[in-house]
Swiss-Prot record:
Manganese or magnesium. Binds 1 divalent metal ion per monomer in the absence of substrate. May bind a second metal ion after substrate binding. GO terms for biological process: DNA replication, removal of RNA primer; mismatch repair. CDD domains: RNase_HII_bacteria_HII_like. Endonuclease that specifically degrades the RNA of RNA-DNA hybrids. SUPFAM superfamilies: Ribonuclease H-like. Residues 11-198 form the RNase H type-2 domain. GO terms for cellular component: cytoplasm; ribonuclease H2 complex. A divalent metal cation binds at D17, E18, D109. It catalyses: Endonucleolytic cleavage to 5'-phosphomonoester. GO terms for molecular function: manganese ion binding; RNA binding; RNA-DNA hybrid ribonuclease activity. This is Ribonuclease HII. It is found in: Cytoplasm.
Length: 198
């Protein structure tokens, strides 16, 4: 079990997380959430450890009960232009700036913080230690998974609904056989190779 997180002294704390750094296709999606202490949400946890059904149920509860929540993203073209780390930081900045209530402290999952206008702290394994980050991870994952399901309708042969764009054996096989879609990240090794850019 990860060690207990000691919260900073602040009134309005936002949690931020991202989903989709590893996939070969689609945007990296981020979320920022300020929870309402008067409307607790039971069962918040790292989105990867929850069933899809539980994530969907918590998604609805978070969007209904949170004081403020916002999504951010960086598109494949931005990822290719900036690199995945900088694109993720940009998407996190977008999520925070989209909050309709300005937080006075921001907790970010991972070991790096984007440049923000308020104090922030990176929390390793934050998605399982900080409720606000857990909530953000759920919003980001449900949103990105839905986008992959929609992409699957446009390109059913790639199996995006199953692997969510991650480089599974099936995805790599289809990429080699069919080539890249306009939604693939051209700077990622397997896509580069298929496009002959290596």
């Amino acid at each position: 079990m990860s060690e207990t997180f000691i919260y900073p002294q602040a009134n309005l704390i936002a949690g931020v997380d991202e989903v989709g750094r590893g996939p070969l296709v689609g945007a990296v999606v981020t979320a920022a959430v300020i929870l309402d202490p008067n409307r607790p949400i039971v069962g918040l946890a790292d989105s990867k450890k929850l069933s899809e059904k539980r994530r969907l149920s918590l998604y609805d509860e978070i969007t209904e009960k949170a004081l403020s929540w916002s999504l951010g993203r960086a598109e494949p073209e931005e990822i290719d232009q900036l690199n995945i780390l900088h694109a993720t930081m940009l998407a996190m900045q977008r999520a925070v700036s989209g909050l309709h209530i300005v937080p006075d402290y921001v907790l970010i999952d991972g070991n790096r913080c984007p440049k923000l206008q308020m104090p922030s702290l990176a929390v390793v394994k934050g998605d399982s230690r900080v409720a606000e980050i857990s909530a953000a991870s759920i919003l980001a994952k449900v949103t990105r998974d839905r986008e992959m399901t929609e992409l699957d309708l446009l390109f059913p042969e790639y199996g995006f609904a199953q692997h969510k764009g991650y480089p599974t054996a099936f995805h790599l096989e289809k990429l080699a056989a069919l080539g890249a879609t306009v939604h693939h990240r051209r700077s990622f090794g397997p896509v580069k190779r298929v496009l002959g850019l290596v």
